[in-house]
């Protein structure tokens, strides 16, 4: 059975658990999976890279949450997380890479997007053929 890597952040653990549960529920029908936790969104791509160099995965899904605060930290973290995940996708183009890092202004927006985005993004990974698959 082909294997998918689920890389998630440790921030907002209750919401991340929902995201991971949705991803696993969809993926386990077709794939085995490994789940690993990064300290935060900025470390997601580096952790994934360390794992995919050593193992064969057909896909990666990144589950994370960044909520805007009162400083520019949100902009720095969200931009760098997206840039590094995009760079990883370019460098490992034989693996399906799905970015499900949800960047929102507040918790109300998170509630609106959490389940829908995770289901939609995981389904993309589920249905995307990978050259490694």
Predicted regions, residues:
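Active-site rim loops that border cofactor/substrate pockets in soluble metabolic enzymes
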Residues: 30-53
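Phosphate-binding/catalytic loops
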Residues: 104-122
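Mobile beta-alpha loop/short-helix "lid" or hinge segments that flank ligand
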Residues: 92-109
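Glycine-rich phosphate-binding loop
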Residues: 47-85, 89
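Short, ordered loop/turn segments at secondary-structure junctions
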Residues: 10-11, 65-66, 101-106
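Glycine-rich phosphate/diphosphate-binding loop of Rossmann-like nucleotide-binding domains
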Residues: 5-32
């Amino acid at each position: 059975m082909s294997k998918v890597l689920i890389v998630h952040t440790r921030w907002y653990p209750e919401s991340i658990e929902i995201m991971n549960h949705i991803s696993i529920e969809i993926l386990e029908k077709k794939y085995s999976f490994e789940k690993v936790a990064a300290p935060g969104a900025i470390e997601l791509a580096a952790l994934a890279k360390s794992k995919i160099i050593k193992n064969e995965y057909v896909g990666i899904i990144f589950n994370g949450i960044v909520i805007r605060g009162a400083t520019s930290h949100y902009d720095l973290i969200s931009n760098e997380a997206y840039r590094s995940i995009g760079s990883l996708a370019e460098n490992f183009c034989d693996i399906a890479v799905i970015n499900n890092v949800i960047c929102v202004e507040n918790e109300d927006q998170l509630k609106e997007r959490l389940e829908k985005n995770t289901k939609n993004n995981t389904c993309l990974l589920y249905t995307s053929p990978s050259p490694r698959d």
